[in-house]
């Protein structure tokens, strides 16, 4: 496979063009491109450009609505609810973090729940936006079954990423962003596309045997981080 290197601003313009061809508005295409390019720049390649085809395919299959009518409902001065109308996840997340920041600035706390959305990349990208406003931030989401309970080889839990961010007193904030699995699925997909091996102990094949083959891992299951120790964390509810 031939590798092509592009400067971030050039790549961003191309990504915007692609998203617009798939029906996104200029604004939504730019928001989505910014998130993908950020992932590349921070080294989270499994959540970067390698995901572009996935989003485009989901638009084509009508899983993602390129022209959503997003509704924001005010529950209280601090709490808001967003119905994203199956928008691309980046747009829903962008609206949500901005609303949370706005609510927090008014009352001291901002809580925002989002429904009818999809994959939005790195939670840390959004947490950092709030941290730059001097806010402590927590972001939670869930996903389809991909992780097996400790001692099993059938998926039951989502990777259910958790993210925490806080100002650090320096220019570099503290951001913790992790799925509750040994490795996120984006990294497995990236390894598969680039013929890379996985670390041992992060996934099982479909027969329940440990594998370092990314293709076999995609057909199998991911393992919970810290094994039995964090298995209990996976059982915690992530939605009401």
Predicted regions and their residues:
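Generic N-terminal amphipathic, Lys/Arg-enriched alpha-helix
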Residues: 1-22
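Short, well-structured alpha-helical segments
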Residues: 26-37
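Intrinsic-disorder/low-complexity recognition with aromatic hotspots
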Residues: 46-50
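Active-site cofactor/substrate anionic-group-binding motifs, chiefly glycine-
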Residues: 51-99
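A generic, well-ordered mixed alpha/beta core segment in the N-terminal half of proteins
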Residues: 81-167
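Phosphate/diphosphate-binding glycine-rich loops and adjacent basic-rich segments that engage nucleotide
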Residues: 147-218
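Extended, non-catalytic structural segments that build the interaction scaffolds
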Residues: 217-229
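Conserved small/polar residues in nucleotide/adenosyl-binding loops
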Residues: 232-240
């Amino acid at each position: 496979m031939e590798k092509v290197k592009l400067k971030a601003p050039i790549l961003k313009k191309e990504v915007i063009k692609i998203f617009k061809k798939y029906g996104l508005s200029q604004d939504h295409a730019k928001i989505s491109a910014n998130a993908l390019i950020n992932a590349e720049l921070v080294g989270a390649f499994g959540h970067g450009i390698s995901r572009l085809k996935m989003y485009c395919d989901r638009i084509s299959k009508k899983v993602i609505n390129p022209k959503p009518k997003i509704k924001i409902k005010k529950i209280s001065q601090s709490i808001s609810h967003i119905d994203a109308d199956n928008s691309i996840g980046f747009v829903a997340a962008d609206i949500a973090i901005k609303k949370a920041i706005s609510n927090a600035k008014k009352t001291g706390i901002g809580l925002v729940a989002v429904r009818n959305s999809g994959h939005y990349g790195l939670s840390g990208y959004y947490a950092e936006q709030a941290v730059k406003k001097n806010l402590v931030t927590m972001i939670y989401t869930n996903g389809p079954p991909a992780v097996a309970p400790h001692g099993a080889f059938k998926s039951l839990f989502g990777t259910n990423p958790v993210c925490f961010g806080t100002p650090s007193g320096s220019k570099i904030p503290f951001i913790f962003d992790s799925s509750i699995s040994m490795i996120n699925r984006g990294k497995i997909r990236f390894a598969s596309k680039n013929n890379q091996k996985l670390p041992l102990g992060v996934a099982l094949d479909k027969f329940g045997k440990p594998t370092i083959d990314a293709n076999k891992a995609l057909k199998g299951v991911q393992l919970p981080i810290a094994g039995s120790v964090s298995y209990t964390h996976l059982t915690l509810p992530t939605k009401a």
